[in-house]
Amino acid sequence: QASDLAKRALSKLLGLLHLGDRLIFVDRALHEKKILFIKLHETGHGWLPHQRDTYALLEECEHTLDPDVRDAFEREANVFAGEVLFQLDRFTQDAADCSFGVRTPLQLSKRYGSSVYAAMRRYARTHAEAVVLLVFDPPDAIPGLGFEATLRRAEQSDAFTARFGRVTWPGKVSPDSQLGALIPIGRRMSSPLPV
């Protein structure tokens, strides 16, 4: 039982920071862009003073972090990694210098070494224009309905929020809904659409 639990925990481990030796261990089976993000994430744990000090204490004892604190630390390390990866506002400035559209984050993902998904999210969240990005999981076939797709992530720019408010998007869509009709069956993404 204990070895199964340890194996399951290790299978979820993508990266690990050893503060004492100043080493970061990363699962090499991951995609190279994910490895870069994980390295930056683990660097965040070591660079943010309150996290570094807390983890240094925990390495010396058998105590663990409260789950809520651990979740907060993980979110902070993710933010740190994103800010470093996209060089604070540099990505946003570069995007503003390019033509408006889906090709811009695709091109910038190569320049910044990020995944396309991360670049699209950053583009939607930080663009000066009204932009929304809706990411759905691959649709599941539903007999009699056609399919159902679950919303994984919604990102909207401040300009979108100012114009339309904080939209509550449906958690699931099917072909008979307005959003469901836009799901790109057999393709990775739909074309950009004006509002």
Residue ranges: model-predicted function:
Residues 1-195:
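Active-site hotspot residues in diverse enzymes, especially metal/ion-binding acidic/histidine motifs
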